Structures are given as C-alpha cells and as structure tokens.
Amino acid sequence: METIARHSQARSSAQKLRLVADLIRGKNIEHALNILTFCNKKASILVKKVLKSAISNAEHNHGSDINNLQVKKILIDEGPTMKRMMPRAKGRSDRILKRTSHITIVVSDSKVKDKKGRG
C-alpha cells in the first residue's frame, strides 16, 4: 500500500534538497533514516521529518509493518520565491531570492522494482 506525506513551502532551495533526496531514493526505511541522521546538511533534517510523517501515516492509516516499508518515490519541487531587497552603495539595491520547496515522499510496503530500458 502506498502512503504519501508532503511538506509545502519548506525554507530551503530545491537544489539543496535534491542532493539529500538522491541519497535515500529506493532505500528501505531503516537505512534511509540512518543516512539522514548522519548526513551533515540542513536539508536532511527537513527530509527526515517528512519521512517520519510518511512512516506514521502508513502505520496509522493502513496498518503497515514498518520493517517492510521502502521509499518508493521522493519528489522535490520548487515552491514560491520570496523576493527581498538588500541596500547597496549609492542608493542602489540588489534583489535577494529566498527560495522554498515542496517535499513529497511516497512509501510503499512492496519491493521497489528496477526500471530497465529496452534496447
């Protein structure tokens, strides 16, 4: 059974979050949590929170066994960008872009199948 957890407008850029997401895609839950615990990035804390939420959703809503869960899909999409101004010399200003992201994690209790190309 597939279970989804989302975090909208996470205060980190999609580029930084995708580095962490690539580490856990397709892994089983125990191994993924272990990777995120020892990953030395702020993005790993955000992804770990969403992953724990997905695990709780699977356990509560579908009665899934935690030991059989795997990260089936993890999507990092760009969210809205907050635009701020930074004063510069001679009355000018520069634009600062504060980027946000949407994190979506799908966990499944079935094995993740490898996609093999044809030809």
Swiss-Prot record:
InterPro entries in the cross-refs: Ribosomal_uL22, Ribosomal_uL22_bac/chlpt-type, Ribosomal_uL22_bac/org-type, Ribosomal_uL22_CS, Ribosomal_uL22_sf
One annotated GO biological process: translation
Entry keyword Chloroplast: no
Molecular functions (GO terms): rRNA binding; structural constituent of ribosome
Gene3D superfamilies linked to this entry: Ribosomal protein L22/L17 (3.90.470.10)
GO CC annotations, alphabetized: cytosolic large ribosomal subunit
Listed SUPFAM superfamilies: Ribosomal protein L22
Keywords, in A-Z order: Ribonucleoprotein, Ribosomal protein, RNA-binding, rRNA-binding
Subunit note: Part of the 50S ribosomal subunit.
Family listed: Belongs to the universal ribosomal protein uL22 family.
Record-linked PANTHER family: CHLOROPLAST 50S RIBOSOMAL PROTEIN L22-RELATED, LARGE RIBOSOMAL SUBUNIT PROTEIN UL22M
Function description: This protein binds specifically to 23S rRNA; its binding is stimulated by other ribosomal proteins, e.g. L4, L17, and L20. It is important during the early stages of 50S assembly. It makes multiple contacts with different domains of the 23S rRNA in the assembled 50S subunit and ribosome. The globular domain of the protein is located near the polypeptide exit tunnel on the outside of the subunit, while an extended beta-hairpin is found that lines the wall of the exit tunnel in the center of the 70S ribosome.
Listed NCBIfam families: rplV_bact (TIGR01044)
Protein known as: Large ribosomal subunit protein uL22
Organism: Buchnera aphidicola subsp. Baizongia pistaciae (strain Bp)
High-level lineage: Bacteria, Pseudomonadati, Pseudomonadota, Gammaproteobacteria, Enterobacterales
